[in-house]
């Protein structure tokens, strides 16, 4: 048993160094909101509004192919 190869040692170190996330973490909770749905999306304004209002990331996303895109803000709840 004293003769452990280097690869076995590395595998054991990898197994024991894994950190598991708890189920109670709030870091995985993201919310989305449509900012001003009546106006077409301008990417610069969308990102700025989302960042300043919600500290999130704004993207212009169309709900269907033929529709004008809306500003969708994704932020940490």
UniProtKB/Swiss-Prot annotation:
Specify the superkingdom. Eukaryota
- Annotated keywords: Antimicrobial, Disulfide bond, Fungicide, Plant defense, Secreted, Signal
Q: Name one GO biological process term.
A: defense response to fungus
Q: Name one GO cellular component term.
A: extracellular region
Q: Which residues form the signal peptide?
A: 1-24
Q: Spell out the disulfide connections.
A: 31-77, 41-60, 46-71, 50-73
Mainly localized where?
Answer: secreted
Q: Name the InterPro entries for this protein.
A: DEFL
Give the UniProt subcellular location, in the record's own words: Secreted
The text of the family note is: Belongs to the DEFL family.
Known PANTHER family for this protein?
DEFENSIN-LIKE PROTEIN 155-RELATED, DEFENSIN-LIKE PROTEIN 184-RELATED
Protein name per Swiss-Prot or TrEMBL = Putative defensin-like protein 158
The gene behind this protein is LCR23
């Amino acid at each position: 048993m004293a003769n452990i190869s280097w690869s076995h040692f590395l595998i054991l170190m990898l197994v024991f160094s894994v950190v598991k996330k708890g189920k109670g973490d709030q870091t995985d909770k993201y919310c989305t909101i449509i900012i001003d749905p009546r106006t077409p999306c301008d990417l610069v304004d969308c990102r700025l509004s989302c960042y300043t209002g919600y500290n999130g990331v704004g993207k212009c996303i169309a709900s269907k192919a033929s529709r004008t895109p809306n500003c969708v803000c994704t932020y940490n709840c």
